[in-house]
Amino acid sequence: MKYIKGALIMFSAISLTVSCSDQSVDKSASNETKPESKAIVVYFSHTGENYSVGVITEGNTAKVAKVIAAKTGADIFEIKEAKPYPQSYDACIDVAKKELRDKARPEIAGALPDLTDYPVVYLGYPNWWGDCPMIVYSFLEKSNIAGKTILPFCTHEGSGLGSTSKNLQKAFPGAKVELNGLSLRGATAQKDAAATEQAVDKWLKSLGKEK
């Protein structure tokens, strides 16, 4: 009887450990299409006062990221800042510009996903002054992305991908950064689901990643 009770306790502990280690990565999208995903969508998105669509509760990039995950069956992970950016548009601009100028590496909230089993990473972010938000670099520098294929996508208000793909390629020469990234206006991502889906479909097809 003692042996059985001990075994049950050990099994429960193992189950709890496995559950806790996976809690930061949402695998619901991949489970709808296949049992194991070989790709993950990693994104940073900002909420609050937006340049073109007012106050938003779900970021523009988040909306695109979820479409990509649903269409590819990829797992999904959101990069969240330990110290949230201001909700005010002007205040957020001031903070983000200073981070860019200082090449800051903002702290990320929570644990990062283990990318070992993901050869493909869809990387999403808003284009802030021609570059990725500095917190995206924080994530990449803390993750092992050597040899991985990085597929960038971004939201913007007129500047497209800017220099983001080239900057990523230069900063992480050990990874395979795809220069043919997806760029979508934030207002489109926020207000036009059909156009967003169409743009994602076209991009995935160009990469040979459509289902």
Where are these regions (language model features)?
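Bacterial N-terminal signal peptides that target proteins for export
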Residues: 1-8
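C-terminal motif of bacterial Sec signal peptides marking the signal peptidase cleavage site
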Residues: 16-19
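N-terminal beta1-alpha1-beta2 submodule of the flavodoxin-like/Rossmannoid cofactor-binding fold
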Residues: 21-118, 130, 198-211
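Solvent-exposed loop/turn segments at secondary-structure junctions
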Residues: 46-49, 81-85, 127-131, 156-161, ...
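Structured segments of extracytoplasmic/periplasmic soluble domains
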Residues: 64-71, 75, 124, 138-143, ...
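Short beta-strand elements in bilobed, periplasmic/extracellular small-molecule ligand-binding domains
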Residues: 75-76, 175-185
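Helix-loop-strand module that forms the ligand-binding subsite of alpha/beta enzymes
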Residues: 87-174
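Post-His helix in hydrolase/transferase enzymes
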Residues: 194-196
